[in-house]
Amino acid sequence: MMQDLRLILIIVGAIAIIALLVHGFWTSRKERSSMFRDRPLKRMKSRDDESENEDFDDNVEGVGEVRVHPVTHAPHGAHGEHEAPRQAPQHQYQPPYERQMQQPVRPDEPVRQPQQSPRQAPVQPQGQQPVPHAAPQPGWQQPQPAQPPVQPQHQPQPVVQQPVAPQPVTPTVAQPQPAAPQQPVPQPVAAPQPAVAEPQPVEPQQPAAPQPKERKETVIVMNVAAHHGAQLNGEVLINSIQQAGFKFGEMNIFHRHLSPDGSGPVLFSLANMVKPGTFNPDSMADMMTPGVTIFMQVPSYGDELQNFKLMLQSAQYIADEVGGVVLDDQRRMMTPQKLREYQDRIREVKDANA
C-alpha cells in the first residue's frame, strides 16, 4: 500500500509540474504575440507621422510661389480660375515676413506694383542665378528675389574672412619659443641629488645579527630563597648543601665537582645571597640568610646541558630541605619557559664555540 501511495503521489506531482510548465510557456507566447501585434501599429503610426511631416515641409517650401500668383491675379478674373486652389495654403503657411510683403500689394493696383519692382533690380545682380529664371516668367515672381539676395549677402562675407586668417604668419614666432624651454633645462641643477638621502638608512645598525656569535660564554643563575618574610636556617642549609654534593672551597663558597667526593673540574657553584656572598662553615649553624645563589659558567667541562640538569636537581633538593622555593636569575618563580630559555642560551654558546 505504501508503495502504491508513493507512486500515486509521484505521478500527481509530475503531472502538476508539467501543467505549470505548459501554462508558463503558453502565457509567455501569448504575451510575445500581443507585443508583436502592437509593433506594426506603432510602425504605421510613425510612418503616417513622417509622411505628414514631409507633406507639411513640401507645402511650406511651395508657399512662396503660391503666395505670389494669387496676389497678382486677384483683380483679373481670367487667371483666378487656374490659381484658385493654391490660395488655401497661402493663408495657412504664410510666414510673418511674407504677409508684410503681401499687405502693400492688396490696396494698390497689381499692374503698377510689378513696374515698381525693377527698383530692386540692382539687388538681383548679386545673386546672378535667380535672374535667368525670372526672365521667362511675367512680373508676378519679382518679389521672390527678396529671399535670394539675403543668402548671397552672407556667402561672400565668409569668403572674405578666409583669406584674412592665413595672412598672419605664425611660423615666424615658433623660432623664439625653443629658446625659452632651453633656459629651464639648467635649472634642475642636481641640487636635490646631493641630499644623499639614500645612504641615510644606517645599515651598520644591522650588526645585531652577529651578536649570537659574540656570545661565546654565559652564566646560568638560579636562586633558592625562603618564602616572603622568612629566612633560611643556617644549620639545615649547610646539611642540605653537603648532601647535594657541594664542597667548600675557593673564594669561601661551595662548589659542585665532577665527582661527589670533591675531585675533578668544577661544574657549578653556590654562594650566599647576602653580600659579600661568602660562607663561614664554623659559624653557619648560627647563621640566618634569605637564600643562596647557584650559578654555572658556560662553557664548562663535559656536556653543559647535562650539567644544567644536575644544577636544577640540586636547587630543587635544597629548596625542599630548607622549605624554600627555586627562583630564576630575576628572582621570580621558575617557569618552564624560563628553563627553555636557559637551554637555548646554552645551545647558542655551544654552537658559537663549535
Swiss-Prot record:
Residues 28-354 are cytoplasmic. Keywords: Cell cycle, Cell division, Cell inner membrane, Cell membrane, Membrane, Transmembrane, Transmembrane helix. It is a single-pass type I membrane protein. Residues 120-144, 152-164 have a biased composition (Low complexity). InterPro entries: Cell_div_ZipA, ZipA_FtsZ-bd_C, ZipA_FtsZ-bd_C_sf. The keyword Transmembrane applies. Its main location: membrane. SMART domains: ZipA_C. Residues 49-60 have a biased composition (Acidic residues). GO terms for biological process: division septum assembly; FtsZ-dependent cytokinesis. Residues 178-191, 201-210 have a biased composition (Pro residues). It is found in: Cell inner membrane. Residues 41-215 are annotated as: Disordered. CDD domains: ZipA. GO terms for cellular component: cell division site; plasma membrane. The chain crosses the membrane at residues 7-27. It comes from the Bacteria. Residues 1-6 are periplasmic. Essential cell division protein that stabilizes the FtsZ protofilaments by cross-linking them and that serves as a cytoplasmic membrane anchor for the Z ring. Also required for the recruitment to the septal ring of downstream cell division proteins. Interacts with FtsZ via their C-terminal domains. Belongs to the ZipA family. This is Cell division protein ZipA. The lineage of its organism: Bacteria, Pseudomonadati, Pseudomonadota, Gammaproteobacteria, Enterobacterales.
